[in-house]
Amino acid sequence: MLALAATLAGCATVNPYHDPARPHHRPDGFNNLHVDNHRADAPSFWRWQWERLFGERAADELHRVRSVPLDAPLLHGNRGDVTVTWIGHSTVLWQIGGLNILTDPHFGDRASPAGFAGPRRLTPLPTALAALPRIDAVLLSHNHYDHLDRGTVHALAAQPGGPPLFVVPLGVDLWMRDEGIPNVRRMDWWDRIALPGPAGEVVVHFVPVQHWSSRTPWDRHATLWGGYVVEGAAGPRPYRMFFAGDTGYSPDFKLLGERFGGFDFSLIPVGCYEPRWFHAGMHVNEDEAVRIHLDVRSRLSLGIHWGTFRLCDEPVHAPLDELPRARARHGVPDEAFVLFGLGQTRVLAAATR
């Protein structure tokens, strides 16, 4: 999100993976499929910053963002159940097929290129990275600082037992290479990879969503962004999960629902979307998140991308108030699209005993 500032400037880059047959490829980077790429002009950006500095903003009610003790015995002892644990923001631990998978891991204090400035973590981490089971795979959705944290990536690469497999969008592999991070698999939209697990094979697909990328003023849209579909065994039938990454609302989601036939569980962002005149199209609000839930045909969805950093103008606790209203507007049962407390775990499907 901090990389919004970097979208105000640009310098030509070369896309080493450019394939003219793919509509989302271009010689200097990548495109969205349904809208023009995010190009925040300088007057709009500085208007937003002026409003942030001098306008009225609702206070964060941080006490409303629950934190629960991590169920470490369950997570370390799990051998086949499908579980989900919300660590904060877009960082989620999935256990499926006997594998431990982290999405967009961020255990740092700031979502920023600098350790002394930028959006600070407002709610405490529910666990240290080292307290989790050994991580087998990391799914990175894009390279913004609230999703790709350098310190966390290096800590994971140095974990006991060896580094996880880092599954990353095209171009992010080059950043990993420059950082000396091993065991990286780059993915284009619709690529898939099969991960052998002790409780069965887990298949990971990289899929299109509507967003953008940048970490500097010179690499806008130079690397790809996206979401993930994860399929594995859960008892007698396959279990299918969707991670939307960071995204605006788009026709991509109905396509995903049709192509995969629906999802047992989805991670959908619900925070960082105000002011709408600036963020609409690239960040969903709660109403659009519920529409994604319906479009992808999700049986159960968990709201992410909230409760951790204040990156936009709505208060950190806003989804606690706005998601119930959005569910009611769309006729979605309360139990079908939920919010967790930090550190909360749920068993989604039990393995065959």
What kind of feature is each model-predicted range?
Residues 102, 106-110, 187-192, 199-212, ...:
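Conserved catalytic scaffold of divalent metal-dependent phosphoesterases
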Residues 79, 87-89, 132-133, 140, ...:
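Extracytoplasmic
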Residues 107-124, 212-220, 274-283:
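Acidic/histidine-rich helix-loop elements
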Residues 107-115, 126-193, 208, 216:
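Active-site HxH/HxHxD metal-binding segment of metal-dependent hydrolases
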Residues 1-9:
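Bacterial N-terminal signal peptides
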Residues 8-120, 125-131, 169-243, 322-344, 348-351, ...:
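Metallo-beta-lactamase
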Residues 12-37, 121, 128-132, 136-137, ...:
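Cap/insert and terminal regions of metallo-dependent hydrolase folds
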